[in-house]
Structures are given as structure tokens and as C-alpha cells.
């Protein structure tokens, strides 16, 4: 790729770097909708939804990273994704994600039975994270 037509993407969590690459397109879902970021995009700061970040590798393939919310910042052709948790598609432990989904579903039922709104919301977030990881692992 021509130097002017690439951007650098870094995905980091509190545990360290999860992904770094150069590309000409990144697609991610913010809390207000999906966005595509290309080289020379206007500076941007947005909060991420629990979803995937897709990084174009070539004309037909994308790297996929599951993110559990966080922020995306773009300036000077550098895209930084800061997330509390992130996993590349190839490192997702499907059986672990299935167990997390089952635990979250059980916690949702318990919270509903106890009319505990705080635990219910926490369990729903855990369920969305587990489902996101499972969906990305199956692409």
C-alpha cells in the first residue's frame, strides 16, 4: 500500500497490546452506529459498543477483534482502540465463551426472580459480551 493510503491500528487493553497492523479500512460499531475509518479521516473520538472491530487485510479478508466496549480515537492516520477486554477471532476460547453465556443467562433469571435491577443489567452486559465472542468465533 502507498504510504499515504494506510493507517495504523492499535488495539490495547489493561493487559497490553492485542492487535497492531496497517490497513486502508477499519470498521467498528460505536454507541451511535457503525463507522468506517480510512486514511486521512477527520480526527475522531467515540465510545465503542460491545461488538467487533474489523480490519481490512486484503480485498477479500478482514481480521476480526471482539471488543467489550471502550473507546476509539483517530488522528494522524493512527487509530487507537482502548477496550477493557479484546480478543482476536483466532484466540477466542469457544467453550469458555459458551460457559460465560450460560452463567450470564442463569444470573439473568436469578436477578429477575429477585427483582434486582443492578444485577440484571450486569448479567445482560455479560451475556452480550459472551454472545459477541461466540458470533465472532463463528465468522
Curated annotation (Swiss-Prot):
Domain of life (superkingdom): Bacteria
Keywords: ATP synthesis, Cell membrane, CF(1), Hydrogen ion transport, Ion transport, Membrane, Transport
Pfam families: ATP-synt_DE (PF00401), ATP-synt_DE_N (PF02823)
Cellular component annotations (GO), alphabetically ordered: plasma membrane; proton-transporting ATP synthase complex
Coiled coil: none
One GO MF term attached to the UniProt entry: ATP binding
Annotated InterPro entries: ATP_F1_dsu/esu_C_sf (IPR036794), ATP_synth_F1_dsu/esu (IPR001469), ATP_synth_F1_dsu/esu_N (IPR020546), ATP_synth_F1_esu_C (IPR020547), ATPsynth_dsu/esu_N (IPR036771)
Signal peptide start and end residues: none
Topology in the lipid bilayer: Peripheral membrane protein
Quaternary state and interactors: F-type ATPases have 2 components, CF(1) - the catalytic core - and CF(0) - the membrane proton channel. CF(1) has five subunits: alpha(3), beta(3), gamma(1), delta(1), epsilon(1). CF(0) has three main subunits: a, b and c.
NCBIfam families: ATP_synt_epsi, PRK00571.1-3
Function text: Produces ATP from ADP in the presence of a proton gradient across the membrane.
Membership in a protein family: Belongs to the ATPase epsilon chain family.
Protein name per Swiss-Prot or TrEMBL: ATP synthase epsilon chain
Amino acid at each position: 500500500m502507498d504510504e499515504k493510503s494506510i493507517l495504523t491500528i492499535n488495539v490495547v487493553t489493561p493487559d497490553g497490546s492485542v492487535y497492531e497492523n496497517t490497513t486502508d479500512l477499519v470498521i467498528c460499531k460505536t454507541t451511535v452506529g457503525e463507522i468506517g475509518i480510512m486514511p486521512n479521516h477527520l480526527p475522531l473520538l467515540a465510545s465503542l459498543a460491545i461488538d467487533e472491530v474489523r480490519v481490512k487485510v486484503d480485498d477479500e479478508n478482514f481480521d476480526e477483534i471482539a471488543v467489550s466496549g471502550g473507546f476509539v480515537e483517530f488522528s494522524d492516520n493512527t487509530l487507537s482502540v482502548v477496550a477493557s477486554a479484546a480478543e482476536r477471532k483466532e484466540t477466542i476460547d469457544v467453550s469458555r465463551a459458551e460457559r460465560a453465556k450460560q452463567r450470564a443467562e442463569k444470573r439473568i433469571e436469578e436477578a429477575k426472580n429477585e427483582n434486582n435491577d443492578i444485577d440484571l443489567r450486569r448479567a445482560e452486559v455479560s451475556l452480550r459480551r459472551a454472545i459477541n465472542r461466540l458470533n465472532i468465533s463463528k465468522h
